């Protein structure tokens, strides 16, 4: 009986490495860091084991560790002391993320800073924009100018990439126009344009103190049941001028990553979100899984689905795995 012998190409590790189709590299990784304004704080986030809220005066230690491991792109999330109803801390020249950006750039000029451009960490109500007094929903068009101000302040501080994440309609177009008018035509936009209203975001909201004080975000983030909607969001953001596209979350949305990859030539970014990280960490800490093997399999799955880059809290761990 004649049959195909697929095992020929699996006969040894060297052979398997030779024909491997998908690879994870340090250059693919973006590392998120939570920064706080108070001094002398390095506080582990209970729902994100191994991830910390870090003071500005201690930030250099975290940046140096990440850089020495081979990480060359980071993303800051600010935890400010004071919040208000319009998120003014987001576009404060001396805001916590702006200061973190300056510190990092003074340490390593070649370290890429990806700026998460949103208001939720800075609003006292925890929503991602200005609240309309009548509808009690986020006012899309009134929120856009504040996003533009935030993006410009982040670039002025040294950010290399703007990543708007509040899912307002038209946010890419408005930010692109604002950056261009301010003389920042060469700053790329990494859009969070495909961001689902996911339950996997829970630990992040603990870390950034950004949970909504009322309602939810389902009027501006996407329904997890929808697939075609992602392509509509992609089409809009490409027309508006985005240079890279984020899919968030990632592991439960690998089909969406593949759809996006099949329908664009811009880099696709998978956000391996807090809930995905925490589930894996919890299982590993209980001895139920082999953390290294599971994490690398998860990263491979995102790359195989079509992701070019991965935002992940596992970034430092992955660098250590790759160094073995």
From Swiss-Prot:
Protein name, per record: Delta-aminolevulinic acid dehydratase
Binding site for Mg(2+): 233
EC numbers, comma separated: 4.2.1.24
Function: Catalyzes an early step in the biosynthesis of tetrapyrroles. Binds two molecules of 5-aminolevulinate per subunit, each at a distinct site, and catalyzes their condensation to form porphobilinogen.
Organism: Staphylococcus epidermidis (strain ATCC 35984 / DSM 28319 / BCRC 17069 / CCUG 31568 / BM 3577 / RP62A)
Domain of life: Bacteria
NCBIfam families given in the database record: PRK09283.1
GO CC annotations, alphabetized: cytosol
Cofactor note: Binds 1 zinc ion per monomer.
One of the Pfam families matching this protein, by short name: ALAD
CDD domains the record matches: ALAD_PBGS (cd00384)
Pathway in which the depicted protein is active: Porphyrin-containing compound metabolism; protoporphyrin-IX biosynthesis; coproporphyrinogen-III from 5-aminolevulinate: step 1/4
Gene3D superfamilies to which the protein is assigned, alphabetical: Aldolase class I
Gene Ontology terms describing biological process: protoporphyrinogen IX biosynthetic process
Binding site for Zn(2+): 118, 120, 128
PROSITE patterns cross-referenced by the UniProt entry: D_ALA_DEHYDRATASE
Cofactor: Zn(2+)
An MF annotation (GO) of this entry: porphobilinogen synthase activity
Record key words, sorted: Heme biosynthesis, Lyase, Magnesium, Metal-binding, Porphyrin biosynthesis, Zinc
Assembly, per entry: Homooctamer.
Amino-acid positions noted as binding 5-aminolevulinate 2 in the UniProt annotation, renumbered to this chain: 274, 313
Similarity comment: Belongs to the ALAD family.
Catalytic activity: 2 5-aminolevulinate = porphobilinogen + 2 H2O + H(+)
InterPro entries: ALAD, ALAD_AS, Aldolase_TIM
Recorded name of the encoding gene: hemB
